[in-house]
Amino acid sequence: MKLSADDKHNVKAIWEHVKGHEEAIGAEALCRMFTSLPTTRTYFPTKDIKEGSSFLHSHGKKVMGALSNAVAHIDDIDGALSKLSDKHAEELMVDPANFPKLAHNILVVLGIHLKPHLTYSVHSSVDKFLATVGYVLASKYR
C-alpha cells in the first residue's frame, strides 16, 4: 500500500505525540492483543505477559521503537525494517497474520490516549502505515 504525502505528514504529526510514550503505548497494545486474542500468546510461553509486566514494557518499547524507526524512514520503510523482517521470518517465525492484530491494538491505544489528534484522516493514515509495516515485515516469509 502506497502512502500519500498526506499520509506521511499525518503519521509524522501524530508520532510527535507518541514520542516519549513508546514503552507505555507498546505495552498496552501488546497486553490488549494478548488478552483479546489468546492465540497470540503462543510465541511467548515462558514470558510474563500480564498487565504491567517488565516483559510487556520491554517488548512494547522494542515494537514501538521499530515503528518509530519506520516513521523516521517513512520514504524507505522496506530498507528501515529489512533486518527486522529477516529476523521475524527466519528466526522468530511469527505468523504474519498476527501483524494486523497488533496494528489494530496499537490503533486502539492511540485512539484512547491521543483522541484529539487521531482525526478520521490521521486514523486512516496510521492504519495504512501500520498495514505497510506489516506487509514489509511479512515480505521475506516463504
UniProtKB/Swiss-Prot annotation:
Binding residues annotated for O2, in chain numbering: H59
A GO BP entry: hydrogen peroxide catabolic process
The keyword rRNA processing belongs to this UniProt entry's keyword annotation: no
An annotated Gene Ontology molecular function: oxygen carrier activity
Keyword Lipid biosynthesis belongs to the record: no
Superkingdom of the organism of origin: Eukaryota
Annotated heme b binding sites: H88
Tissue expression profile of the protein: Red blood cells.
SUPFAM superfamilies: Globin-like
Signal peptide interval: none
Keywords: Heme, Iron, Metal-binding, Oxygen transport, Transport
InterPro entries registered for this protein in UniProt: Globin, Globin-like_sf, Globin/Proto, Hemoglobin_a-typ, Hemoglobin_oxygen_transport, Hemoglobin_pi
Residue span(s) of domain Globin: 2-142
A cellular component annotation (GO) from this entry: blood microparticle
Protein role: Involved in oxygen transport from the lung to the various peripheral tissues.
Protein family: Belongs to the globin family.
Subunit field text: Major hemoglobin is a heterotetramer of two alpha-1 chains and two beta-1 chains.
Protein's name in the database: Hemoglobin subunit alpha-1
Provenance organism: Triturus cristatus (Great crested newt)
